[in-house]
């Protein structure tokens, strides 16, 4: 172990020596750049662009380009990047993560690699965690980029598609991570190429990279549409039932936060819902409602996991930032279960049209880098998942903050009493205090305690984060006391007021340890910026969430052995600090394993998504007649159906093929059984294909010109693909839940998921081709007048696709349809899985 650590330290030292040499080369250009006039310095941008076009690489331009940005920053912003900031910039350009402490000027550091990479003309995305930081950084740093001749765009959720397109077309685009993800998904749902807003993803520089790529890695971005729902009553019934249970009726596993009914709970459920067997296959849907109601009532906690807004809506609280996540909803019916629990209106369920996780979104960029003050603890995950190294950058000035050892108390009451005393003492002498909590509930509780003690203070949590920046900016003033949920206000520096340095600087107090050491380090890092004095102190209790879940029994036994009173039994020991850190490492390990497993599942979806989106993009951007592609789909659909019936008895086979042809390919009266008799399978395929092409040509002839034909083909294919893809996403979600249960039968759930989803994907492709064929042949196309606007082309083309619904024709004899044949209704499913099931 010691050898491994030594190797890591030596590698870091070697990397830093290399970075120092490169930074010195940039600094060597300082006098040369300082001698240039403003116009000459600005002209460097066009010169660099030309040199890049002529074959020089960005690496070749690095030293001069960085020197130009340094000089530009001095003239425009009055800031001159330090050598350590140049080193950080080089790491960012190489597609890695420089670990830079709070207050070391990460925003200014980013200007150098952003400028350099923007010279290529392919777009640079600077990604932040919220829109306040997006606008702030784009406004402050945009002044420098504009002065140097680069365009800067700001991408906000409220902007129109035209404004977003303009923002993405700029050399540099500032945006939140979620907005880039949603724009990507929406771009892959449009019908016309000109409605897309993004360019291909080139280079992303992610601020607070650990928050986005680690903490939110599992969060799927979902674009969904409402599904008509008659299940609201079931949510309320399940909620009423669950609220009637006693503690003995359900079992909670605290470490994994899972819950289920005990035997007595199952008996009560069967009695309540008048069932013989709750776990009969017919009651699967009901057990899902009960499970969600259990989670909502006994796992999800008001003001910790979610809050109820003034508009009577359930808003999710981000566990890492303490902010409410506007527009986000728990999936799979859990959000509705919480709505029923809290007595607010239950909203309809939605169906996912498109989704992607941040892990897969950011892995699509050609180059990815990011900045944070705390990434070293997650180095393995950055390397394994994103192929990114973490390189610690030294501080410009030595850190002067004093980090006190943790204080451990037996109860929450004694802990908070000590916190209030400490805050009061520091407040009286004028030292500013920032108190970090892990939940909204704790903030409110502590706030009441401080009010009772007569200590004026500000509270920053999920309920008022719109005042976030203002509160944080004042947190370093003399006598200021600020309570902040977790890492709310991250990205905004706390500057010390007059006379505060002499009082010891900002004191950060943590009221409990977070699951992740990194989050604790972020809280500590709010104090002692750029060599300022400061202090940090964590107060813990045996009743804290982390201590309850992981190993507080041994510590409690020690306290009991000494028989200390509440006031006396405060422990300050390195041994206990190490135990707490060991518990944190265990949780971090569990979370990493979970994220790795999620990625294994999500990679399957990623591969399939990329195929569908690539095909979709090809259709949207095609400036040609798509007849060859549609002809191929028609041929494959015919071949599949005939091959699928090849082993059936001759009479049964021909009947099935005739029904298929009549109701999916050609006019009913144009074909009869005698046309198929005496032909081999290959001859039947050829005959049907020939007839289908005649129908295709007659359909196309009804359209007024080549432009209308192309529009019709595109809308037809895209409409089918989008509907089938939406259904496929839903099916994959259900499959994922199902294979999780197969793990109990000694099968590897990931392998099962991969093989099953591959089969489902192939079925979906067949189903897409079947529907395109059926719609093409059976669409009622009317002679069109020339539309007045381009928009009308899409609506007219869409309106023309009005084929019959997938209902069975009245004269179909179900007895003659084989179980494994395609259902004659045209759904694309096998008969046994469609009308044969009824």
Swiss-Prot record:
Give the UniProt family note. Answer: Belongs to the SecA family.
Subcellular locations according to the entry: Cell membrane; Cytoplasm
Record Pfam families: P-loop_SecA, SEC-C, SecA_DEAD, SecA_PP_bind, SecA_SW
Q: Ligase: present as a keyword of the record?
A: no
Question: According to its UniProt entry, what is the function of this protein?
Answer: Part of the Sec protein translocase complex. Interacts with the SecYEG preprotein conducting channel. Has a central role in coupling the hydrolysis of ATP to the transfer of proteins into and across the cell membrane, serving as an ATP-driven molecular motor driving the stepwise translocation of polypeptide chains across the membrane.
Q: Which GO terms describe its biological process?
A: intracellular protein transmembrane transport; protein import; protein targeting; protein transport by the Sec complex
Keyword list, A-Z: ATP-binding, Cell membrane, Cytoplasm, Membrane, Metal-binding, Nucleotide-binding, Protein transport, Translocase, Translocation, Transport, Zinc
Needed cofactors: Zn(2+)
Q: Which GO terms describe its cellular component?
A: cell envelope Sec protein transport complex; cytosol; plasma membrane
Domain of life, source organism: Bacteria
List positions binding Zn(2+). Answer: 823, 825, 834-835
- Per the record, the major location class is membrane
Task: Please list the residues that bind ATP.
Answer: 85, 103-107, 493
What is its EC class?
Answer: translocase
Please report the record's description of how this protein sits within the membrane: Peripheral membrane protein
List the Gene Ontology MF annotations in alphabetical order: ATP binding; metal ion binding; protein-exporting ATPase activity
| Reaction(s) the record says it catalyses | ATP + H2O + cellular proteinSide 1 = ADP + phosphate + cellular proteinSide 2
Write the Enzyme Commission number(s) for this entry.
7.4.2.8
Point out the coiled-coil segments of this chain: none
Q: How is the cofactor bound?
A: May bind 1 zinc ion per subunit.
Q: How does it assemble?
A: Monomer and homodimer. Part of the essential Sec protein translocation apparatus which comprises SecA, SecYEG and auxiliary proteins SecDF. Other proteins may also be involved.
This one is known as Protein translocase subunit SecA
């Amino acid at each position: 172990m010691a050898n491994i650590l030594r190797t890591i330290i030596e590698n870091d030292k070697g990397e830093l020596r290399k970075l120092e040499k490169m930074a010195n080369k940039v600094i060597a250009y300082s006098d040369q750049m300082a001698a240039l006039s403003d116009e000459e310095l600005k002209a460097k941008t066009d010169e660099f662009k030309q040199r890049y076009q002529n074959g020089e690489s960005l690496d070749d331009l690095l030293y001069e380009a960085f020197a130009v940005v340094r000089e530009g920053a001095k003239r425009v912003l009055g800031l001159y990047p330090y050598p350590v900031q140049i080193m950080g910039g080089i790491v960012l350009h190489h597609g890695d993560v420089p670990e830079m402490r709070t207050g070391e000027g990460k925003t200014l550091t980013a200007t150098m690699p952003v400028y350099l990479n923007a010279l290529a003309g392919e777009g640079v995305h600077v990604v932040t965690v919220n829109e306040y930081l997006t606008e702030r950084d784009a406004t402050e740093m945009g002044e420098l980029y504009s002065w140097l001749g680069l365009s800067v765009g700001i991408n906000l959720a409220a902007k129109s598609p035209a404004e977003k397109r303009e923002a993405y077309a700029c050399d540099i685009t500032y945006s939140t991570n979620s907005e880039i993800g949603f724009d990507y998904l929406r771009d892959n749902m449009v019908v016309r190429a000109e409605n897309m807003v993004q360019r291909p993803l080139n280079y992303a520089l992610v601020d607070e990279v650990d928050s986005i790529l680690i903490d939110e890695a599992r969060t799927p971005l979902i674009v969904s549409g409402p599904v008509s729902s008659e299940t609201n009553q079931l949510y309320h019934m399940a909620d009423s039932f669950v609220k009637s249970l006693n503690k003995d009726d359900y079992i909670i596993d605290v470490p994994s936060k899972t819950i289920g009914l005990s035997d007595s709970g199952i008996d009560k459920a069967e009695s309540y819902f008048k069932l013989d067997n709750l776990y009969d296959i017919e009651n699967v849907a009901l057990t899902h409602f009960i499970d969600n109601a259990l989670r909502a009532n006994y796992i999800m906690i008001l003001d910790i996991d979610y809050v109820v807004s003034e508009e009577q809506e359930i808003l999710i609280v981000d566990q890492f930032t303490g902010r409410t996540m506007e527009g986000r909803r728990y999936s799979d019916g859990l959000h509705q279960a919480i709505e029923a629990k809290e007595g607010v209106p239950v909203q309809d369920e939605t169906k996912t049209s498109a989704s992607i996780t941040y892990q897969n979104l950011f892995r699509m960029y050609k180059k990815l880098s990011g900045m944070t003050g705390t990434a070293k603890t997650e180095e393995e995950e950055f390397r394994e998942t994103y192929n990114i190294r973490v390189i610690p950058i030294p501080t410009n000035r030595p850190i002067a903050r004093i980090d006190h050892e943790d204080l451990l108390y037996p109860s929450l009451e004694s802990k908070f009493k000590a916190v209030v005393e400490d805050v009061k003492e520091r407040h009286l002498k004028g030292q500013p205090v920032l108190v970090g909590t892990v939940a909204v509930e704790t903030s409110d509780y502590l706030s009441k305690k401080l009010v009772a003690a007569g200590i004026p203070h500000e509270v920053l949590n999920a309920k008022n984060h719109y005042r976030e920046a203002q509160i944080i900016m004042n947190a370093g003033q003399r006598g200021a006391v600020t309570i902040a949920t977790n890492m709310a206000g991250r990205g905004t520096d706390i500057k010390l007021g007059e006379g505060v340095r002499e009082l010891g600087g900002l004191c950060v107090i943590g009221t409990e340890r977070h699951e992740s050491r990194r989050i604790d380090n972020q809280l500590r890092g709010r104090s002692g910026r750029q060599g300022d004095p400061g202090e940090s102190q964590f107060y813990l209790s045996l009743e804290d969430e982390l201590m309850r879940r992981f190993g507080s029994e041994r510590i409690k036994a020690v306290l009991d052995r000494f028989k200390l009173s509440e006031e006396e039994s405060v422990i300050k020991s390195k041994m206990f600090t190490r135990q707490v850190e060991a518990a944190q490492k265990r949780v971090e390990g569990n979370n990493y394993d979970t994220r790795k497993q999620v990625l294994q599942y999500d990679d399957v979806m990623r591969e399939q998504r990329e195929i569908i989106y690539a095909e979709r993009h090809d259709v949207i951007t095609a400036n040609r007649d798509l007849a060859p592609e549609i002809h191929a789909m028609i041929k494959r659909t015919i071949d599949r159906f005939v091959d699928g019936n090849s082993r059936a008895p001759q009479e049964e086979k021909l009947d099935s093929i005739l029904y298929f042809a009549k109701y999916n390919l050609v006019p009913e009266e144009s074909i009869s059984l005698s046309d198929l008799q005496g032909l081999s399978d290959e001859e039947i395929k050829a005959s049907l294909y020939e007839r289908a092409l005649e129908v295709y040509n007659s359909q196309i002839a009804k359209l007024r010109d080549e432009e209308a034909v192309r529009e019709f083909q595109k809308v037809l294919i895209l409409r089918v693909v989008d509907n089938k893809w939406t259904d496929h996403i839903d099916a994959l979600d259900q499959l994922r839940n199902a294979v999780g249960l197969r793990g109990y039968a000694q099968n590897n759930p990931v392998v099962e998921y991969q093989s099953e989803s591959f089969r489902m994907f192939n079925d979906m492709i067949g189903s897409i081709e079947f529907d395109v064929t059926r719609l093409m042949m059976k669409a009622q196309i009317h002679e069109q007048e020339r539309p007045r606007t381009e928009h009308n082309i899409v609506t007219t083309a869409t309106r023309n696709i009005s084929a019959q619904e997938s209902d069975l024709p009245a004269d179909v004899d179900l007895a003659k349809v084989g179980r494994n044949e395609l259902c004659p209704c045209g759904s694309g499913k096998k008969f046994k899985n469609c009308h044969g099931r009824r």
